[in-house]
Regions:
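Active-site-proximal polar cores
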Residues: 560
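N-terminal lobe/hinge region of extracytoplasmic solute-binding protein
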Residues: 68-125, 231-233
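Extracytoplasmic/periplasmic ligand-capture domains
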Residues: 7, 11, 15, 19-59, ...
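Acidic glycine-/aspartate-rich tracts in secreted/extracellular proteins
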Residues: 72-73, 140-142, 194-195
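N-terminal secretory signal peptides that target proteins for export/translocation
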Residues: 1-5
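Residue-level signal for short, function-critical loop segments
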Residues: 71, 433-435, 564
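Surface-exposed binding/hinge segments that line
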Residues: 170-218, 242
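General beta-strand recognition
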Residues: 66, 107, 132-134, 186-188, ...
Length: 595
């Protein structure tokens, strides 16, 4: 059903730096701060005539907070590189049509109301299975230069995204045929297929609306200057950017919510060393640190002037990706992996790993065991938790024809499905360097556990840019040059449909079409996922739980445990609320200071 026209493929190596930051909280920065140029001039802002000189009350003291991040954001356009730090500053300055609150409820931004079937804003053609979504925009939102935000800005943003030369794939954009402005405050999105994620498609964590009168369409969505010198619709304006040191944001006088933001100034300071940032937080020199790691949380738990906000559920799940195609191949049917193509081996690997032990010992108990994709609201499925049972794991390997007949402690193929007789059960367990020491320690423990059941496991650590680069660039996963990889992944928001497509749909196993890097092909799963593109929530729940059973039986990906989703902040700062649906600054306009 779903065929992605992903002209972003050429940019995949850049886009997938996402995992260096967004695949969980990384203890160390993925790379040195991005080499960028600070804006030569700030964007034009609306001017206000001075008031007549009269006796005025003494002004209130200017309030200011400091947010620490390890590297400069590449830009304010989080759709491009998605390092997390771009989304953090984007939330300070720019709005989309709608976002999500921590409970998963739609939070209107530029939109005046949420279009639904009940209010007539969503119209579905039951025969063609297409839909039209009509958005009504607020009439009181202006760009920071005083220009009203209109439906033309929404059309402009869409056309910039889908430009075949300078555009970028974003989730669900392949379902959109066109976007039309009916008037200044009404825009219609025409879908070629029912798309359940429409509510936050032009909003959420990664996408905002851009100004048609200010951004240069010739420069293109990925590279335009307005991505680094933005006009603001959000609560703050960019006042200064000293690359490698800090960014200064001040209140947006045109912000449409009266009395907000509650803090006059936000300074985003670049602090590459997380231990330095932790000390600054404890000493009161930093007010917010996004993505606090498990060791940092342990160190901060007794600090009297620091509080921790932890999301109610988890987003990032550490997982193993077993390649079902022979190493260097992308065809699991013609060239099955000699070891991992047998589901009994994949099941044995899961049984051999002590998830609780690793989570407690390495990740300080903050992570929780996860064994199904449907572990977080609103879609929960009852899948029994697998046991940690090395003896059962060894028995499965025996059954699969992997035995140790030469007595060296490592198994060889004796009647196995896909390897030659006598071939050793030897494979490589690979992870990425940027996560840091904790993940490498976890990798070592997993290697030891697999060795104990007779698997000869070699460990390797590579740069994420090598692991996740696109096919043309020789990305190890896209070209299939790996055995068993370890990294963390997850999705924002409340709709897992696109995430499931990218990770498990058969078409996504093709190079650069998605992240079905295990090359798992299952027509039954594909059919269920096709059916899930509906607005019938009860039916979607039923479909997802059927998918959960297939994933449990086939184990194309082995889920292990969640990593913590938490942010640390000073006790004087009120209103910080961590969420799996967005970055910590999602509600920055509501933050206040209590001295």
């Amino acid at each position: 059903m779903k065929t992605l026209d992903r002209f972003v493929v050429s940019l995949l190596g850049v886009v997938l730096l996402v995992v260096l930051a967004t695949c969980g909280a990384t203890p160390e920065p993925a790379s040195p701060p991005v080499e960028t140029q600070a804006p030569a001039t700030l964007p034009p802002q609306a001017t206000t005539p001075p008031l007549e000189a009269t006796a005025a009350p003494e002004p209130a003291a200017r309030t200011s907070i400091v947010v620490a991040i390890p590297e400069d954001p590449p830009s304010f356009n989080a759709s491009v590189a998605d390092t997390g730090y771009d989304a953090l500053v984007m939330e300070l300055t720019l709005l989309g049509l709608a976002d999500l609150d921590p409970e998963g409820n739609v939070l209107l931004e530029l939109a005046a109301e949420l279009p639904t079937v009940d209010n007539g804003g969503v119209v579905i053609d039951e025969d063609a299975w297409t839909m039209e979504v009509t958005w009504k925009l607020r009439d009181d939102v202006r760009w920071s230069d005083g220009t009203p935000v209109t439906a033309a800005d929404v059309v402009f943003t869409y056309e910039a995204i889908v430009d075949p030369e300078t555009g970028l794939w974003v989730p669900g954009i392949d379902y959109v045929d066109s976007v039309e402005a009916l008037d200044d405050n009404t825009v219609v999105i025409y879908y070629n297929y029912v798309y359940p994620g429409y509510a936050t498609q032009f909003g959420g964590e990664q996408l905002v609306i851009w100004p048609a009168h200010y951004c240069d369409p010739e420069q293109g969505f990925v590279a335009w200057d307005c991505g680094r010198q933005p006009l603001s619709t959000g609560p703050y304006l960019l006042e200064e950017w000293q690359v490698g040191d800090h960014m200064t944001f001040v209140r947006n006088p045109n912000y449409h919510e009266a009395g907000k933001p509650g803090i006059d100034q936000v300074i985003v300071r670049i602090v590459p060393d997380p231990s330095v940032a932790k000390t600054m937080l404890m000493q009161g020199d930093v007010d917010v640190y996004m993505w606090a790691t498990e060791p940092m949380l342990d160190d901060l738990k007794d600090a009297p002037n620091v509080q921790v906000s932890q999301a109610a559920t988890s987003r990032w799940v550490m997982r193993l990706f077993p390649n079902q195609a022979a190493r260097g191949s992308i065809d699991p049917e013609a060239d099955p992996h000699p070891i991992l193509a047998d589901v009994r081996v994949r099941r044995a690997i899961r049984l051999a790993i002590d998830v609780d032990g690793i989570s407690q010992e390495i990740f300080r108990g903050y992570g929780q065991p996860v064994w199904t994709e449907f572990f977080r609201p609103p879609y929960l499925c009852d899948v029994p938790r697998p046991a940690h049972d090395p003896e059962a794991a060894a028995a499965l390997l025996e059954e699969a024809g992997w035995t140790d007949e030469d007595g060296d402690g490592m198994r060889e193929c004796h009647g196995c499905l896909h390897a030659a007789e006598g071939d050793p059960m030897s494979l490589e367990l690979m992870t990425y360097a940027e996560y840091g020491e904790a993940l490498e320690l976890a990798q070592q423990l997993m290697g030891e556990m697999l060795n104990q059941i007779g698997m000869d496991v070699r460990l390797s650590v590579v740069e994420g840019s090598v692991m996740w680069a696109d096919y043309e660039s020789g990305g190890l996963e896209q070209v299939g040059d790996y055995d068993l990889n370890l990294w963390d992944d997850g999705y924002s928001g409340v709709d897992p449909t696109d995430f499931l497509w990218e990770l498990y749909y058969s078409t996504a196993a093709e190079p650069d079409m998605g992240w079905n890097i295990t090359r798992w092909i299952n027509a039954d799963f594909d059919a269920l996922l096709d059916e899930a593109y509906t607005l019938d929530e009860e039916y979607r729940q039923e479909l997802f739980c059927q998918m959960a059973q297939i994933l449990e039986e086939e184990l194309p990906v082995i889920l292990l445990f969640s990593t913590v989703n938490a942010d640390a902040h000073s006790a004087r700062l009120q209103g910080v609320q961590s969420t799996v649906n967005d970055l910590v600054t999602w509600n920055v306009a509501d933050w206040t200071l209590v001295e």
